[in-house]
Amino acid sequence: MRDKIKLVSTAGTGHFYTTTKNKKTTPDKLEMKKFDPKVRKHVMYREDKIK
């Protein structure tokens, strides 16, 4: 089953993306570079729980 996750910007702007991931195939936390429109740059985004 795919679970919903939140990808939070490491730039400290509070911007986030929501996506899904399969926890069986990727048990570790996701990290990827995505565009942060608040700083207008590509920065690292880390997985966080959706509350």
From Swiss-Prot:
Q: What GO cellular component is one of the record's annotations?
A: cytosolic large ribosomal subunit
Q: What protein name is recorded for this chain?
A: Large ribosomal subunit protein bL33
The organism named in the record is Acidithiobacillus ferrooxidans (strain ATCC 53993 / BNL-5-31) (Leptospirillum ferrooxidans (ATCC 53993))
| Family as reported in the entry's similarity comment | Belongs to the bacterial ribosomal protein bL33 family.
Q: What biological processes does GO assign it?
A: translation
Check the record and name the InterPro entries matching this protein.
Ribosomal_bL33, Ribosomal_bL33_CS, Ribosomal_bL33_sf, Ribosomal_zn-bd
Highest classification ranks of the organism: Bacteria, Pseudomonadati, Pseudomonadota, Acidithiobacillia, Acidithiobacillales
Q: Which domain of life is it from?
A: Bacteria
User: Keywords for this entry?
Assistant: Ribonucleoprotein, Ribosomal protein
What one GO molecular function would you report for this record?
structural constituent of ribosome
> Which residue windows are transmembrane per the record?
none
